[in-house]
Amino acid sequence: MLKNDLFLRALKRQSTPRTPIWVMRQAGRYLPEYRAVREKTDFLTLCKTPELACEVTIQPVDLMGVDAAIIFSDILVVNEAMGMDVQIIESKGIKLTPEIRSQADIDKLIDPDVEEKLGYVFDAIRLTKKELNDRVPLIGFSGAAWTLFTYAVEGGGSKNYANAKKMMYREPQMAHQLLQKITTCISNYLIKQVEAGADAIQIFDSWASALSEDDYREFALPYIKQNVAAVKAAYPEVPVIVFAKDMNTILSDVADTGADAVGLGWNIDIAKARKELNDRVCLQGNMDPTVLYGTPEKIKSEAAKILKQFGQHTDCSGHVFNLGHGILPDVDPANLKCLVEFVKEESAKYH
């Protein structure tokens, strides 16, 4: 029995005495304790060593007092499981080989046994659940198919996604085939994370805003919908968050994926989002991560503004406080602690 289930209750739009808070990338470089672990190993080895992944997953729970933990991993483990070589090169970025550009390339990708290929993630989840000892829920996650597709086709990050879009526009059937192959792997991966002990799931579509609204509806949303449906078919009680970065103009479509919660970027007023979606999903967000460079007073005033904009809770509303994207690596940890403590205290008046 979880000692603190506020996060899960908020996702299900059940009443809570205050607004729960966690932040994306909360296990990361801004923490000296994380850097101490990271100095001893490279990033992917850290992801693949359950004891280390568990240690850094729990750090922000111990040090910052957040209301949920998120398993330490990377979205590109799915691409690697499908047969791509993934390298994360310090100061140079991400390189995936081979780039997936042809039918033959797609055919060579495997439909992996996720238990075999991604067992280290499930081991890390099991170990973390044990070590958390029911203090807070644990979030499992995956990248969305569109975002993983862009990495596969581009062979890394991209400024304009030219190769990914070339495939979309010239060979749409091929693009859909690759997206479907990735989606099947994601669904299996998410279900196994829940089986290992994840209490909730987040799907990150980091490069969502590279697409127009219509293209997002065609090449991204149907696959997210499949992932949500797969998790819900196996585990109807497990809440799913969809974070489609900066797709503020089609929030209603994102909510229609069947997700319990929609993650918001910082460039939308949360009051507008709540009004548009009319409390049919929980909202997660949405402070600009750079606010954490500010003074404690500024951090508190910005957090207070978001809580006030969301407004008074009803018996069917839900809000999880978060940033609009990941915490930046050079933020002072004391500033995040200030935010967490303030949100816990200030939010009670709206419940």
UniProtKB/Swiss-Prot annotation:
Pathway it works in: Porphyrin-containing compound metabolism; protoporphyrin-IX biosynthesis; coproporphyrinogen-III from 5-aminolevulinate: step 4/4
Domain of life: Bacteria
Site positions (Transition state stabilizer): 74
Protein name, as recorded: Uroporphyrinogen decarboxylase
Pfam family, one: URO-D
PROSITE patterns: UROD_1, UROD_2
Zinc as UniProt keyword: no
Main location class: cytoplasm
Top EC class of this enzyme: lyase
EC numbers for this chain: 4.1.1.37
Signal peptide extent: none
Keywords attached to this entry: Cytoplasm, Decarboxylase, Lyase, Porphyrin biosynthesis
Gene Ontology molecular-function annotations: uroporphyrinogen decarboxylase activity
Subunit: Homodimer.
Listed HAMAP family: URO_D (MF_00218)
Subcellular location: Cytoplasm
Source taxonomy: Bacteria, Pseudomonadati, Chlorobiota, Chlorobiia, Chlorobiales
Recorded GO CC terms: cytosol
Residues engaged in binding substrate: 25-29, 74, 151, 206, 325
